[in-house]
């Protein structure tokens, strides 16, 4: 029944839709938020002021959805939580994030995208689960993905259970399957598997990016 209500809410006029989300589900939705024809199914939701979510996005089986102010999510994106054991299914987008169209995010673990970061182009995939051998058997386990502040991710990149430091750029088509520690310079990560291709001057890197 809950899923049916959420599905029907998608087509409601903007003021009624947001009122329904607040009153019925207790979600926190800021001022001047615009919600397009997108399906949102999450346990708790906190959307900051002036955020815009476009059309035909799907947020499914999320335990927690947190979106900072002035963030923009375009169209046809998929954010899928998981029922696997230990799944956090937590998606956190910082302030002024730009998330363009036709991307896929597996939110089995915790996926964080820092302030002023951009997921550009189309067809990028972000995966937050891995497979391990437990007592001789294969077992899926959730893992985290952390994208720092002011990161740019190019089209058709694949990010798997990794940390991307603040200020980094991920080249189009790259496959990032390991974490890269923060440095005093901006990193260009590219290739399959991704490696550090170039270091740029540290101008404008957020102070937090070099903290332990």
What role is predicted for each listed range?
Residues 169-187:
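C-terminal/domain-terminus segments
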Residues 1-32, 50, 116, 130, ...:
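Terminal amphipathic alpha-helical/low-complexity segments used for targeting or macromolecular assembly
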Residues 5, 17-18, 36, 102, ...:
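Residue-level detector of alpha-helix boundaries and kinks
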Residues 39-40, 86, 187, 208:
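A sequence-level detector of short, solvent-exposed, charge-rich linear segments
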Residues 40-47, 52-164, 179-182, 192-193, ...:
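Flexible, glycine/small-residue-enriched loop-and-beta-strand segment within the central core
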């Amino acid at each position: 029944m809950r899923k049916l209500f959420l599905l029907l809410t998608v087509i409601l006029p903007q003021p009624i839709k947001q009122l329904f989300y607040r009153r019925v589900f207790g979600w926190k939705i800021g001022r001047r938020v615009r919600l397009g024809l997108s399906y949102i199914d999450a346990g708790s939701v906190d959307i900051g002021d002036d955020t815009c979510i476009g059309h035909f996005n799907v947020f499914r089986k999320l335990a927690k959805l947190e979106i900072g102010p002035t963030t923009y999510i375009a169209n046809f994106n998929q954010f899928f939580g998981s029922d696997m054991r230990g799944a956090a299914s937590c998606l956190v987008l910082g302030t002024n994030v730009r998330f363009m169209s036709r991307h896929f995010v597996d939110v089995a673990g915790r996926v964080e995208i820092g302030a002023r970061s951009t997921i550009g182009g189309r067809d990028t995939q972000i995966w937050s689960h891995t497979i391990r051998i437990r007592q001789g058997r294969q077992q899926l386990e959730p893992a985290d993905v952390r994208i720092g502040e002011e990161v740019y991710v190019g089209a058709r990149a694949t990010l798997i259970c990794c940390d991307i430091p603040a200020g980094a750029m991920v080249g189009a088509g790259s496959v990032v399957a390991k974490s890269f520690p923060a440095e005093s310079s901006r990193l260009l990560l590219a290739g399959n598997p991704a490696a550090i291709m170039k270091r740029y001057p540290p101008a404008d890197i957020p102070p937090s990016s070099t903290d332990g």
